[in-house]
Amino acid sequence: MAEAELPDEAQLGLRLPETRAQRPSGFDLETWAAAARFDIPERAASFIQRVESAAEAYVVRELFRIPGVLYDGGASVYYHGAAIRLQVPASVYRLDLVVQFEEIRLAVEIDGLEHHGLTQAQFARDYYRARRLMIGGFVVVRFTASEAMTQPRQCWRDVFAILKTRSSIERLA
C-alpha cells in the first residue's frame, strides 16, 4: 500500500487498545499486526512491543525504515546521535515518544479523537499537560493519530526538522 493509502483502525476493523491495561488477556501485538496486514521489521519487534496505539506502531515502524537508524535491542533507537525512546515516564505523565539530542528533549505525543474527546475539560487538560512538560524542559510535538497512520515519514521529517532548528548540529537529516 502506498503511504497515503494506509488504512485506519476503523477500516481494518481492528483496534489496538489504547493502553496495555486495556489489552485483553492473551493479546499479542504480532497477532494484531498480522491480522491488520501490518508488517513489523524483524529488528524492530522488541522495540515496537512498547507501543500503546496503532498510530504509534505506524510511526515506530516508519522509524526503522529510515536509513541510518541504529537499534541494539535495548530501550532506545538512535539516529545521528539522537536517542528515541517509547513510553517514557516524565513526572506524573507518560510520554508516547521522547527524542533527545544533547540537551534538547522533544516530547512527541500521538493521539486520536477517541483519546481526547471533544470536551472542553480534556482540551484544558491537554494544554495544562503541555505547559507542565515545557516547564520541565521539553519541546512538545503533537501529531494526530490520522497523521501518524497516513504520513508517518512526514512525522519523522517534522520531528528531526524541529530538532535540527534547536541544535547547532547540521548533521541531522
Give the predicted meaning of each segment.
Residues 94-127:
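Short beta-strand-loop-alpha-helix junction that forms the active-site gateway
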